[in-house]
Amino acid sequence: MKLPIYLDYSATTPVDPRVAEKMMQFLTLDGTFGNPASRSHRFGWQAEEAVDIARNQIAELVGADPREIVFTSGATESDNLAIKGAANFYQKKGKHIITSKTEHKAVLDTCRQLEREGFEVTYLAPQSNGIISLQALEAAMREDTILVSIMHVNNEIGVVQDIEAIGEMCRARGIIYHVDATQSVGKLPIDLSKLKVDLMSFSGHKIYGPKGIGALYVRRKPRIRIEAQIHGGGHERGMRSGTLPVHQIAGMGEAYRIAKEEMASEMARLRTLRDRLWNGVKDMEEVYLNGSLENGVPNILNVSFNYVEGESLIMALKDLAVSSGSACTSASLEPSYVLRALGMTDELAHSSIRFSLGRFTTEEEIDYTIQLVRKSIGRLRDLSPLWDMFKQGVDINSIEWAHH
């Protein structure tokens, strides 16, 4: 077993060796290096064929028509293109958008930008289990609501939203529904031929494909229109200009092909490992599970260890690559906005750790993790005056701290 142990698969994944091998075929002179938009010679045709194959592989995993898949530079761009693109195109129908407070920053910051441009956005608070109440969503819908953006799986706590029911509600009212599926694709079955979802964002690097490539599903029946955000050449049916990076697209296609084949067995294995990890730490004092084991993806476990500071815990766990909050926001020392939105105290949110497991996680690594966590928590609590006070029965919330 090699240290440190990587348990941050929700931040990114290593490229699967099969994917890396596939990508190598599209880089050098002796490979298929052409521009897929070059229509006048074989180099271009072969590159275009590789893109078509990948587009089909992605469409097959999610039950879409390949013509509904638009390649982007990643899920962040897909979220931007979907939300800004739909808002700009349909703004004559209304300027109201609904999303949730626990979305990824790529959705929240995009909505904030649209607010600056004159749109109105309702940010729904989830219930304490992380799920958006369908009644609250319905109550927020108005005559001028044009777009709802609610993710499939949350990147911090792994809870799964009922995108099927939300889709039905939106379709019945003629509202466009966008789903960020970055954390669910390849982990949960998605069938867009049955779901009433109009726009869906995908990433390559969260399921063992390369970074810097993603896709946006844009429904054809009923036809959804979006306004392009990047212009120049009219690639990707006019929705996203720019020379297609064939090596990255082929890599993403291969990653999605592998996911389709291995998803069922891989998720069963990860569920066993995640449950093993939780069972190994849940009997400690003041340990809380954030999210839900029943209604969550099998690869994410978010746990709060009360009376232990998250930052010091991460330092103590230096042999584990884990995160507190998500990588996109962990550069700041603010407690996780997702956990705060669940109604958690700052202290408890600050003491949370996200363990995310993946294809190369082993049972041996999980057992080592359990031992290390138990040892580290014990040591940090021995050093903590707050833990002493808690053990003596002092109500810490009632203490008035001196302001120096």
Curated annotation (Swiss-Prot):
Pyridoxal 5'-phosphate binds at A75, T76, N155, Q183, S203, G204, H205, T243. The keyword Translocase does not apply. Pathway: Cofactor biosynthesis; iron-sulfur cluster biosynthesis. One of its GO terms (biological process) is [2Fe-2S] cluster assembly. It is found in: Cytoplasm. Its EC number is 2.8.1.7. The keyword Chaperone does not apply. The modification N6-(pyridoxal phosphate)lysine is found at K206. Homodimer. Forms a heterotetramer with IscU, interacts with other sulfur acceptors. This is Cysteine desulfurase IscS. The lineage of its organism: Bacteria, Pseudomonadati, Pseudomonadota, Gammaproteobacteria, Enterobacterales. The gene is iscS.
